[in-house]
Amino acid sequence: MVSDNSGNLYIVAAPSGGGKTSLVKKLIEMVGEIEVSVSHTTRPMRPGEKEGVDYFFIDEKQFISMVNEGAFIEHAKVFNHWYGTSVAQINKRLQFGIDVVLDIDWQGAEQIRHAYPDAVSVFIIPPSLDALKERLMNRRQDKDHVISERMTKAQDELGHYPEFDYLIVNDDFEKAAMELQSIVIANRLRIEKQVNKQAKLLSFLLSSQ
């Protein structure tokens, strides 16, 4: 769908509480020319979140209207709330050579891979289920029954890891962030990307023989 001069598309997925959002934010700090695609959602805004930065917060009527208009490249209902990724947002950035990261769940990842076969997908897993539960509890965002639901769903989500290109264990946050950064840097150096980016240099070097 995009040329070799365009940006790269990355999918980062994980079970709820797996740390994907924190890792993606760290990745943006570490790497230039890369942005997070801001999704639309019908869930309530959480403390500390900002409109248009973390999500575009809309009601269900607006969301369904956007679905019917074909505004989303992927959308899914997760824990009774809708999430969707804007086609226009992704394509605009890719066309300008900006890498785009999608912070989504495995359902969204599956839809994205169909639309963008060259997308690079990364699955983040916790070091243990106990660690995952502890992280969910430490967030202080959900009631006990919601945490139980998330833990049950997490075991199903973890079973989808073979569908992804890369697997990162988020045990040591800094190490996991560096591994995610390494994937992005290595992908940028692929021959099909470099052959256009370094066309002038390659031409000069070869003509000097």
From Swiss-Prot:
The UniProt catalytic activity note for this protein reads:
GMP + ATP = GDP + ADP
EC number per UniProt: 2.7.4.8
Keywords of the record = ATP-binding, Cytoplasm, Kinase, Nucleotide-binding, Transferase
| Residue positions binding ATP | A14, P15, S16, G17, G18, G19, K20, T21
> Domain of life here?
Bacteria
Q: Name one GO molecular function term.
A: guanylate kinase activity
Query: What pairs make up the disulfide bonds?
Result: none
- InterPro entries in alphabetical order: GK/Ca_channel_bsu, Guanylate_kin-like_dom, Guanylate_kinase, Guanylate_kinase_CS, P-loop_NTPase
- Show the GO cellular component annotation of the record: cytosol
What CDD domains does the record tag this protein with?
GMPK
Please report the stretch or stretches of sequence annotated as the Guanylate kinase-like domain: 7-185
Where does the UniProt annotation locate this protein?
A: Cytoplasm
Q: Please state what class of enzyme this protein is.
A: transferase
Q: Which HAMAP family match?
A: Guanylate_kinase
Family membership, please give it.
Belongs to the guanylate kinase family.
Q: Its function?
A: Essential for recycling GMP and indirectly, cGMP.
Per its UniProt record, what PANTHER family does this chain match? GUANYLATE KINASE, GUANYLATE KINASE-RELATED
Q: What is this protein called?
A: Guanylate kinase
Q: Which organism is it from?
A: Legionella pneumophila subsp. pneumophila (strain Philadelphia 1 / ATCC 33152 / DSM 7513)
Q: What is the lineage of its organism?
A: Bacteria, Pseudomonadati, Pseudomonadota, Gammaproteobacteria, Legionellales
